[in-house]
Design a protein with these regions (language model features):
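Amphipathic, Lys/Arg-enriched alpha-helical "gate/interface" segment within cytosolic domains
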Residues: 1-126
């Protein structure tokens, strides 16, 4: 249905929300949109809220997303990515993505609670 985002430069974060059914082309278009947003900068920690998402990416789609991240490494920079889910299947797919994501760029954690995810994002990196 919709993927929306907001960039909070004061907090140094990108907030992404997926709501309802989303397709791979919608996911990729959303990524292209925030990567070219004038407010986007490398290293923005990201909170991706999938609690209202109905569909999940397939393994090939996750691999495609990881490839986009690798190709845009200079624009994305090193960052933390917190993924918030409410359904077990979404939690599992998010963990799969964490294993596929380029570790040199992303530190990925999956949460069931938005507040815990935000707290992790604001902790100093080791």
């Amino acid at each position: 249905m919709a993927i929306t985002y907001q960039i909070d430069l004061h907090a140094g974060m990108l907030f992404v929300v997926a709501d309802g059914e989303t397709t791979q082309s919608e996911r990729l278009e959303a990524m292209r949109t925030w990567l070219t947003d004038p407010m986007f900068r490398p290293g923005l920690h990201t909170l991706c809220d999938l609690t209202a998402a109905v569909t999940v990416p397939t393994l090939p789609e996750l691999e495609e997303i990881a490839g986009v991240i690798r190709r845009h490494a200079a624009v994305i920079g090193r960052k933390k990515l917190a993924i918030v889910t409410s359904r077990p299947v979404t939690f599992g797919v998010a963990r799969q993505f964490g294993a596929l994501a380029p570790g040199a760029l992303l530190t990925v954690q999956v949460f069931k609670d938005r507040h815990a995810a935000r707290a992790w994002l604001t902790e100093p990196s080791a």
